[in-house]
Amino acid sequence: MDAVTDTPVTEMPAPFVFTDAAADKVKELIEEEGNPELKLRVFVQGGGCSGFQYGFTFDEAINEDDTVMNKSGVQLLIDSMSYQYLVGAEIDYKDDINGAQFVIKNPNATTTCGCGSSFSV
């Protein structure tokens, strides 16, 4: 309840899911880098066999158009252009028989390539 208007407050669902496994791995990588100011930037760019591909990098700066998500002490940054392609996506980290990697499950992708690193909408 909003104390001022006495109306129910509806919380907006997070625009993406950043799993505990992904946050834990990012935290581990940041600790290895020795720079607690680092944040994980996830982005979409043109390329790959399906038209778009995902990218991951560390960044110290939060840009004006970034959406910031906090999870387990880790900040995830997504720029406004990439945001539109990632709404509803799950960003996870898998370590299995196929290897260790960050994985994005994206409901907006209409097709993906065989390796899963590029997609189209």
UniProtKB/Swiss-Prot annotation:
<protein>
    <recommendedName>
        <fullName>Putative iron-sulfur cluster insertion protein ErpA</fullName>
    </recommendedName>
</protein>
<feature type="binding site">
    <location>
        <position position="49"/>
    </location>
    <ligand>
        <name>iron-sulfur cluster</name>
    </ligand>
</feature>
<dbReference type="GO" id="GO:0016226">
    <property type="term" value="P:iron-sulfur cluster assembly"/>
</dbReference>
<keyword id="KW-0408">Iron</keyword>
<dbReference type="InterPro" id="IPR035903">
    <property type="entry name" value="HesB-like_dom_sf"/>
</dbReference>
<dbReference type="GO" id="GO:0051537">
    <property type="term" value="F:2 iron, 2 sulfur cluster binding"/>
</dbReference>
<comment type="subunit">
    <text>Homodimer.</text>
</comment>
<feature type="binding site">
    <location>
        <position position="113"/>
    </location>
    <ligand>
        <name>iron-sulfur cluster</name>
    </ligand>
</feature>
<dbReference type="InterPro" id="IPR016092">
    <property type="entry name" value="FeS_cluster_insertion"/>
</dbReference>
<dbReference type="InterPro" id="IPR000361">
    <property type="entry name" value="FeS_biogenesis"/>
</dbReference>
<feature type="binding site">
    <location>
        <position position="115"/>
    </location>
    <ligand>
        <name>iron-sulfur cluster</name>
    </ligand>
</feature>
<keyword id="KW-0411">Iron-sulfur</keyword>
<dbReference type="GO" id="GO:0005506">
    <property type="term" value="F:iron ion binding"/>
</dbReference>
<dbReference type="InterPro" id="IPR023063">
    <property type="entry name" value="FeS_cluster_insertion_RrpA"/>
</dbReference>
<keyword id="KW-0479">Metal-binding</keyword>
<comment type="similarity">
    <text>Belongs to the HesB/IscA family.</text>
</comment>
<dbReference type="InterPro" id="IPR017870">
    <property type="entry name" value="FeS_cluster_insertion_CS"/>
</dbReference>
<comment type="function">
    <text>Required for insertion of 4Fe-4S clusters.</text>
</comment>
<dbReference type="GO" id="GO:0051539">
    <property type="term" value="F:4 iron, 4 sulfur cluster binding"/>
</dbReference>
<dbReference type="Pfam" id="PF01521">
    <property type="entry name" value="Fe-S_biosyn"/>
</dbReference>
